[in-house]
């Protein structure tokens, strides 16, 4: 198949540093090519150029990875779906200005590739988008990129790897001595003098993540965060917020969910982080094996390509 992937046009693809959507688009391209498909990436904010580039390529399918491009979707003449990576999709009370984008989704009623069943339900119930227009297509991870060791250099450290901002809430947990932070800084409440590792490059992420005991992600909103799968691929257990558990098997002892009503109980949070870390460093092979279900090639074969085929079939009917 000939497949067009449309990025936000904000950062380069592949990204040189931060950029979860950009690395998702790039890794999707690599995995699709591994399976024999031809892939075009369009990464510009210019709507006319997007349409012209699509028409020049004449794809079998177009996947838009930026929800603010929803007004363009009706002008795409090929089978098409759009994915939102907005972190508050499952928390409509946090939409604020996003309501304008949401209203466009209600108007256009596009095909939507949803990152989780919870997000699919929001589109079906709140947005009144027909179930037949929504498809669950989880994110994957390029497992082979990640260094993996059985004995990490910092088994007594947990890492909070994310952009340091208001949604991620890192500043709340800085009294936890064993918790370290990596990410670009966008929150003046965060104290950079304590356990701050700076912003990591992609190479550092791939090479050094495995040296920590486990990953912590306690945001007040998420949409199937890539960093959780990256951590699993590196052999780390994960401690996540309620919205970070999408597509994870929460019965696994190396996956811990902190209820939102306990998020300010720092003593409880610390105990759960330490408990998860102590289990995780002894069961790295189990974690690494579990991560293989999120390998991009497996995700594409199980979810993504069957969903594309359904959209194409519907387009022709």
Model regions and ranges:
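Membrane-proximal helix-turn-helix segments that form the acceptor-binding/catalytic region
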Residues: 88, 93-112
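Acidic anion/phosphate-binding donor-loop and adjacent secondary structure
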Residues: 92-93, 124-125, 138-156
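Short beta-strand->alpha-helix junction loop in the catalytic core
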Residues: 118-119, 136-146, 185-187
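Conserved donor-binding/catalytic core segment of Leloir-type glycosyltransferases
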Residues: 113, 150-180
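A short, active-site helix/loop in glycosyltransferases that binds the activated sugar's phosphate group
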Residues: 106-133, 141
């Amino acid at each position: 198949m000939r497949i067009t992937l449309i990025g936000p046009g904000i950062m380069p693809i592949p990204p040189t540093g931060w950029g979860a959507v950009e690395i998702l688009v790039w890794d999707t391209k690599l995995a699709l090519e591994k399976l024999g498909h031809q892939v075009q990436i369009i990464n510009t904010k210019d709507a006319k150029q997007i349409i012209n580039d699509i028409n020049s390529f004449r794809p079998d399918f177009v996947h838009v990875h930026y929800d603010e491009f929803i007004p363009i979707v009706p002008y795409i003449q090929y089978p098409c779906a759009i994915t939102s990576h907005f972190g508050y999709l499952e928390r409509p009370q946090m939409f604020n200005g996003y309501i304008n984008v949401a209203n466009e989704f209600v108007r256009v009623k596009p095909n939507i590739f949803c990152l989780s069943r919870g997000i699919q339900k929001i589109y079906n119930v709140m947005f009144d988008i027909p179930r037949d227009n929504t498809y669950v297509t989880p994110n994957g991870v390029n497992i082979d990129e990640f260094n993996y060791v059985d004995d990490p250099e910092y088994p007594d450290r947990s890492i909070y790897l994310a952009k340091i901002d208001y949604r991620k809430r890192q500043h709340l947990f800085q009294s936890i001595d064993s918790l370290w932070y990596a990410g670009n800084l966008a929150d003046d409440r965060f104290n950079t003098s304590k356990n701050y590792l700076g912003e990591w490059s992609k190479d550092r992420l791939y090479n050094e993540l495995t040296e920590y005991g486990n990953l912590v992600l306690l945001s007040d909103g998420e949409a199937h965060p890539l960093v959780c799968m990256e951590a699993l691929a590196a052999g780390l257990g994960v401690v996540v917020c309620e919205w970070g558990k999408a597509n994870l098997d929460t019965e696994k002892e190396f996956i811990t969910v902190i209820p939102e009503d306990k998020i300010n109980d720092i003593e409880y949070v610390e105990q759960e982080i330490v408990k998860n870390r102590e289990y995780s460093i002894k069961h790295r092979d189990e974690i690494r094996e579990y991560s293989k279900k999120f390998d991009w090639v497996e995700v594409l074969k199980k979810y993504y390509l069957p969903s594309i085929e359904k959209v194409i079939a519907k387009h022709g009917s």
